[in-house]
Structure formats: C-alpha cells, structure tokens
Amino acid sequence: ILNRHDRPTAIFAGNDEMAVGVYVAARKAGLRIPEDLSIVGFDDTPISARIWPPLTTVRSPIREVGRAAADLLVKRGAGSSGNQELQSFQLELVVRESTRTI
C-alpha cells in the first residue's frame, strides 16, 4: 500500500506497537515521517515518545476503563444480570511529531 502511486497520506494504527511497524514499512518504502506520511497510534505507550519522530497517539483512560470493567464483573458476580451498560470514556489526542497538516 505504501508503494502505490495513490498511497495514503496518513495511517491510523490500532495501537502504538503496530504504528512502529508502519514506521519500519514507511522507511523501507523511502517515505519520510511526517513529510510523506503521517502516522497515529493508540494507547500512548512509552515507545510512542521514544521513537523518532515521536509518535502522535491517542491516550485512553486505562485505569478508568479497568475500574468500570471490574465494577461490572462484581455486579454480574453478585447475581445481577441487569441490562447491558453502555459507557463512554474521554480519549485524549497526544500530538507529537509524526503528523503534519496537508
């Protein structure tokens, strides 16, 4: 996909580790990050700030999500089948140097 004439200008990876794989593939294809390809990851893991250029990523509230999941398991373990619950969590875009405006 990165060697195509109509290649994408940006890739959103499912997590930061996958984004590192995109960095490797982009460099093998001779692409510069972010000049030729913007890359965004997800999870804001430590590697996102250590690679070059530092990865723009999405941070999710891991503890809050874990706490909500544990609360739901406790409710279900106590015999409450209840209705399915829909919860939403605030995500944060951590802008670093792997993206640019086109």
Region locations from a protein language model:
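Flexible loop/turn connectors
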Residues: 3-102
